[in-house]
Amino acid sequence: MKKKFYIYVGLLLAIIAGSFLWISRQKEEAKARVYEAKKSAPIHLTKAEFISKVANFTANQTDWKYLGDKPCVIDFYATWCGPCKMVAPILEDLASQYDGQIYIYKVDVDAEPEIAAAYGIQSIPTLFFCPMNGTPQISQGAMPKESFQKMITEVLLKK
């Protein structure tokens, strides 16, 4: 009788330990998936980040000089803007599709009005397609994903 009791207790403890290990592994995998998703998501920029990663518009207001190490797309948007909300999931998909090849930046014109004013942003969404050299190509309004892909391929990746 005692032998059966110890066997049942042992099995119960093994099941509990296995459950804890399985739950722990699931949490680690979920964290890894979240990290991967964040790694390839559009990057929201503040004024200081824009100046250090994209262009220092405070020091040089006449000439565009891109500071990044990869071409980029800059989305000037507002949280209340309908067309901007339509473009957002497209940019998330493109961030994953072109991960490692380009950056996709987002600038909230309400939170960062100085950046918007420096580049004359009056219509949103306004998108800058910034190659490594030369001036950015500018597009205003929402576009289908295929148009974004064409601009990225031709202007940024030059394929």
What is each of the regions a protein language model found here?
Residues 45-71:
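A short beta-strand-turn-helix
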